[in-house]
Amino acid sequence: MVAKLTDVAKLAGVSPTTVSRVINRKGYLSEKTITKVQAAMKTLGYKPNNLARSLQGKSAKLIGLIFPNISHIFYSELIEYLEIELFKHGYKAIICNSQNNPDKERDYLEMLEANQVDGIISSSHNLGIDDYEKVSAPIIAFDRNLAPNIPIVSSDNFEGGRMAAKLLKKHGCQHPIMIAGKDNSNSPTGLRQLGFKSVFAQAPIFHLSGELSIIRKEMEIKVILQNEKPDGIFLSDDMTAILTMKIANQLNITIPHELKIIGYDGTHFVENYYPYLTTIRQPIKDIAHLLVDVLLKKIDHQDTPKDYILPVGLLSGESV
């Protein structure tokens, strides 16, 4: 049976109000009383209900994180850094995996609002502006324009695409292509595409749906390699770049002599397990730090700029 606040009060020999004051650290209390209450809480295994505290107008110290795909290696690493940063500041994270599903994203948003979380960091993009503007909690967006009043933190996606294209050009590529997702031009992938096109205006861009299975994705990439015979490819994420290297090897296409490949994200996973891949690195740790910093300023009712853009870098491997 779950222990209640009144059970703690009875065991400690104090009033429920005193127990509440100990939990919330309010008013003067003797060390003896605090020790008695804490000992009773430990004996009974009592845990304060943060959501109930939020309903009383007190901070629940909870932050909602809404992401489209937490199994994606970039998002999983970013979420890990966000949780670490939030914990440093006394906040716990509620992780919501929207799976690019508008209904699921809306349900999560409503759940976080109902539980009066202190703030929300979101990278999902399925809902309309009205859905996010209705939320009273401070919101910070990662890489997405959620609403006019919501600050956006991102890395320089346009420059990342341009950097990749310039590197392929430097290494003599005559028939480069880009393989990307099906996002619009204002999305992170879309901005990388614009950066790539600023160097290779005539280069073909091939769009693969994020909903494709690995087998179907592999088939699509294989057809592209066989039909286009590119000498350089920029891919909008590292995992697709790694898959492309695998397919190229199966087709006996040597990397980097016949085909140069550049990925995007530069996670620690890729750096440690696929160091062969040359990729554009996003400053994931800095992104997490800035997202939390801006959110805490919004929670504290401070004015913040609308856009924050962090520089990207090059993680050199041997695929170029």
UniProtKB/Swiss-Prot annotation:
This is Sucrose operon repressor. Keywords: DNA-binding, Repressor, Transcription, Transcription regulation. Negative regulator of scrB expression. PROSITE patterns: HTH_LACI_1, HTH_LACI_2. Residues 5-24 bind DNA. GO terms for molecular function: DNA-binding transcription factor activity; transcription cis-regulatory region binding. It comes from the Bacteria. Transmembrane segments: none annotated. CDD domains: HTH_LacI (cd01392), PBP1_Qymf-like (cd06291). Residues 1-57 form the HTH lacI-type domain. InterPro entries: HTH_LacI, LacI/GalR-like_sensor, Lambda_DNA-bd_dom_sf, Peripla_BP_I.
